[in-house]
Amino acid sequence: MKTILRNLFYTLKRFRTASVLNLLGLSTAFAAFMLIMMKASYEYNFDTCYPDSDRLVMLNFGEEKDNSITLLPRGPIDFLIQQVPGIEYGTIYAPCWQKQAFCTNPENPQYFYETPWAVYPDFGKVIGLQFVKGSDKDMDKPESIIISESYARKLFPKGNALGSYLYTEGDNGLVKRIDKFRICGIFKDLPENCQFKNDMFIRMSDYQKDDWASQNYF
């Protein structure tokens, strides 16, 4: 072992330029390999973070070889959820059409702007959200909201997020005439390689219910 190390250091000392170039090339190749493997792992494991992910089905209109996701009307999605016997839970989801101003204290508002996603009450059951505090059982109430664990820490550093309110201004088609939302559940953060990376989910209103023409939903 000592002989090998001695020869190695002798070679490095004698052929400094070549040794440096070889080490740089090896380091670059290794870094490129790691980046490629990280990207491959990201894509291969995309949307596999959900429990029983192999049982999840997403309705989409398009060509078989087309990888795009199509916005759909609300009517046919609701019809399939209600009429197909094999569907245990179903949901639609859509981002609110504009960023909304929220605050945690209406008396001294420090506004932050977010685009919450509107979902059905069973959304958490569909993708298997893991709640660290509270639950989604109150998501059938229009003023309920669930937020991620990291977002709860950000908004409420004292740890009192559950049961607190987020106050908002403005109106939105997906959530009408609601100026405050009660946090009923805090879920474990979802990984980056999934399509549900949002930190806030609110209950979908009845807007465009039974509409078979407007294409605004997933």
Q: How would you label these PLM feature ranges?
A:
Residues 17, 85-89, 160:
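Glycine-centered tight turns that cap/initiate beta-strands
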Residues 36-103, 110, 209, 214-218:
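Membrane-proximal extracellular/periplasmic loop immediately following the first transmembrane helix
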